[in-house]
Amino acid sequence: MYYKKSKLNSVVKNIPEYRQPKEVYKLLFFYNPDILIITGHDGMLNKESNYYNIDNYRNSKYFIEAVKEARRYEREYFKSLVIFAGACQSYYEALISAGANFASSPSRILIDFIEPLIVAKKVAVTNNEKYLTIDDIYKELKNGKGGISGIGAYGKAQKILL
């Protein structure tokens, strides 16, 4: 619904987190998108635990593996893919290290389900000559930089010359 209102072409697949690493490659091959959102449900299993231990997260390991599979697809098919990955309280640093351009949640907070969509829309409508950073997006996000951050990406919109 959000993408239809924005007049963006999108495909939405509801895939359980544990299956995402196994499904993402073939979906990328079939749909050949410019932007990929890997999300679902996540959370820290013990809030007083070490932030940097993958075993302390419900589903971050699956998102990380899905990002790696997406980057493998990108290398094999010479694709330039922008990836958002993560959910509430996800292991942000590992998602970025795996290859996500934007991820949640640097402050290990809950994010609104619409926030990854806002990031994807901003990438989609920004000219491909402009490099977007979280500084270009965070004011539109409910939780700002605490919920989502990243290394950035070039926009995907193309200029049309007549």
Regions found by a protein language model. Give the residues of each.
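Short helix-loop-beta junction
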Residues: 2-11
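Short beta->alpha junction loops
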Residues: 12-19
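Short acidic active-site motifs
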Residues: 20-24, 91
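Proline-aspartate-enriched helix->loop->beta-strand connector
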Residues: 28-42, 100
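Short glycine-rich, flexible loops that bind phosphorylated cofactors or substrates
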Residues: 44-45, 112
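A short, glycine/acidic-enriched catalytic loop
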Residues: 45-63
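Catalytic cores of nucleophile-dependent amide-cleaving enzymes
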Residues: 64-111
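C-terminal functional extensions of proteins
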Residues: 107-162
